[in-house]
A protein has these predicted regions:
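Intrinsically disordered, low-complexity non-transmembrane regions of multi-pass membrane transporters
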Residues: 1-27, 168-173, 227-240, 276-283, ...
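N-terminal signal-anchor module of multipass membrane proteins
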Residues: 1-89, 97-105
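Hydrophobic transmembrane alpha-helices of multi-pass solute/ion transporters
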Residues: 7-18, 191-195, 208-257
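Membrane-embedded helical hairpins/re-entrant loop segments and their flanking transmembrane helices
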Residues: 21, 47-87, 257-328
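Hydrophobic, membrane-embedded alpha-helices of multi-pass small-molecule transporters
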Residues: 22-39, 176-192, 207, 222, ...
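Short, non-helical or kinked segments that cap or interrupt transmembrane helices
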Residues: 61-62, 83-97, 136-145, 203-210, ...
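Interfacial segments of multi-pass membrane proteins
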Residues: 103, 196, 316-331, 337-342
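Membrane-embedded alpha-helical modules
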Residues: 105-226, 335-396
């Protein structure tokens, strides 16, 4: 950006550098746009599994909490307290990796889900003490298989949403699988594809969001958008602890803890990527430990108030490389944006007013990208007979 032309490379690579306010606001908003859809989508999916109507007050609440606690967890990373936080520009958001586990837990009850999230988050934070020592247990073969399997599991969910929604209630509607739903989903996919490959910068990074906005506007003209929920929603609301209860289920807790290990390894990779790509150095043990602490504590606190598990967002790591600005104050501004959005139910209601087929088009793209990320991890694997056998059995 023109206002950064006179800034030295040393400052741009310095996490403590504070750019001019107008630059920080623009860059911070870019970080929010790059992660917004990925952050709120898991909440909408879990709301559907829990039986909450699309656009209901409970769905709006879960969307709010996903924004609010993504912002709070990000502040834990950028500002930190004590040993908590990498103190690097690490953007946090709701993790897709936990969605398969959360779907099963939500079917048992929301109290069971949030009990698992809180305890899983505490276990995640505990791993910060020794995360560096167990990284070698999760080579690209293991991590890649897990991420690929998650993506493959989730893609059918996206297809159901594109058709008009998952679950018996949505699938029993006469419009389910109709041309109107598929048309909206396909518009999202085509616009996202076009913007990703034929534009650059923040437009390319926000291609899925812009694709969904395009389809949303078309849906308004089709008469498929109900604005009544926005009118009813309040302008301001605080989070409510244990709104859905807190129940202990050993199976769910074990599953959450296992996925926390995967999430912790992902965060370590993202922090390493930020340090290497943004500052041309290796991440320190203190940064890796602090980042893992923030990941876990952010998840545990979110679970208390109805938020879902948080992790670092890889797309924002790429955005740092693209802008060349390593400043953690920029991501702090992004966190403040998210917190403000999370305190305004009308924003959650606006997101929830989106036709479910529009969301379906977006999640087909995003879940496909999750699977692609797993394949990318596997590209560095030495495909000998041993590894091929491990891959075949694990994927089956």
């Amino acid at each position: 950006m023109s206002t950064l032309e006179n800034v030295s490379q040393e400052d741009l690579k310095n996490p403590d550098y504070v750019p001019p306010l107008q630059v920080g606001l623009v860059l911070g908003l870019q970080h929010v746009l790059a992660m917004f859809v990925s952050n709120v989508t898991p909440s909408i999916i879990i709301a559907g599994v829990a039986g909450f109507a699309f656009g209901s007050a409970d769905t709006v609440f879960l969307i709010q909490m996903s924004m609010l606690f993504a912002g709070i967890a990000t502040l834990m990373q950028t500002i930190g307290f004590g040993p908590v936080g990498a103190r690097l520009p690490v953007m946090q958001g709701t993790s897709f990796a936990f969605v398969p586990v959360m779907i099963g837990a939500a079917k048992m009850g929301m109290g069971t889900l949030f009990g698992g999230i809180v305890i899983g988050g505490l276990f995640h934070a505990f791993m910060g003490s020794f995360i560096g020592k167990i990284r070698h247990w999760f080579p690209p073969l293991v991590s890649g298989i897990i991420i690929l399997a998650i993506g493959i599991y989730l893609i059918p969910v996206g297809i159901q949403y594109a058709a008009g929604g998952a679950g018996e209630f949505n699938m029993s509607k006469p419009t389910w699988g109709g041309l109107g739903n598929w048309s909206l989903a396909i518009i999202v996919i085509l616009v996202s594809f076009g913007l990703k490959f034929w534009t650059k910068g923040i437009i390319s990074s926000s291609s899925v969001l812009l694709g969904m906005i395009t389809a949303y506007i078309i849906a308004i003209f089709m008469g498929d958008v109900n604005f009544s929920g926005i009118d009813k929603a309040a302008w301001f609301a605080l989070p409510e602890p244990f709104k859905y209860g807190f129940d202990i289920n050993l199976t769910v807790i074990i599953a959450m803890c296992l996925m926390s290990i995967v999430s912790a390894i992902e965060t370590v990779g993202d922090i390493s990527g930020i340090a290497k790509g943004g500052a041309n150095r290796e991440a320190t043990d203190k940064e890796l430990q602090g980042g893992t602490y923030a990941d876990g504590i952010g998840t545990a606190v979110a679970g208390i108030f109805g938020g879902l598990p948080n992790t670092s967002f890889s797309q924002n790591v790429g955005l740092i490389s693209m802008t060349g600005v390593m400043s953690r104050s920029v991501v702090t501004i992004a966190a403040i944006f998210l917190i403000l959005c999370g305190l305004v139910p009308k924003i959650g209601a606006l997101v929830s007013s989106m036709p479910i087929a529009v969301l379906g088009g977006g999640v087909i793209v995003m879940f496909g990208m999750v699977a692609s990320a797993g394949i990318n991890m596997l590209s560095s694997v030495n495909w000998n007979r041993r590894n091929m056998m491990i891959f075949a059995i694990s994927l089956s």
